[in-house]
């Protein structure tokens, strides 16, 4: 009886792993936009942190220091949005597991 239960658990774990892999592949294609300076700088990136496009309003081109800050802020905004989306998508797979707070998957 124990052997059958263990086999069932292993099968469930394998199915969860396959589903997580599919979800990660899908998330790698999902795009999120980070914005800073009331839209003066926009960054489009995937949830896999691949930057696809950066849009900069011409009005901020003359102030290098401000532009650098806005680019960093827009990138950070996009990363946060991507991580939140990924967390929501992956939470369905980990809802039954007792993982410590802040634990990130995949390992």
From Swiss-Prot:
Q: How does it assemble?
A: Homodimer.
Record organism: Dechloromonas aromatica (strain RCB)
Check the record and name the NCBIfam families matching this protein.
DNA_YbaB_EbfC
Q: What name appears for this protein in its UniProt entry?
A: Nucleoid-associated protein Daro_0807
Q: Where is the signal peptide?
A: none
The answer on whether this UniProt entry bears the keyword Ribonucleoprotein reads no
Q: Which family does it belong to?
A: Belongs to the YbaB/EbfC family.
Chief place of localization: cytoplasm
InterPro entries from the UniProt entry: YbaB-like_sf, YbaB/EbfC
Keyword annotations from UniProtKB, A to Z: Cytoplasm, DNA-binding
Q: Where in the cell is it found?
A: Cytoplasm, Nucleoid
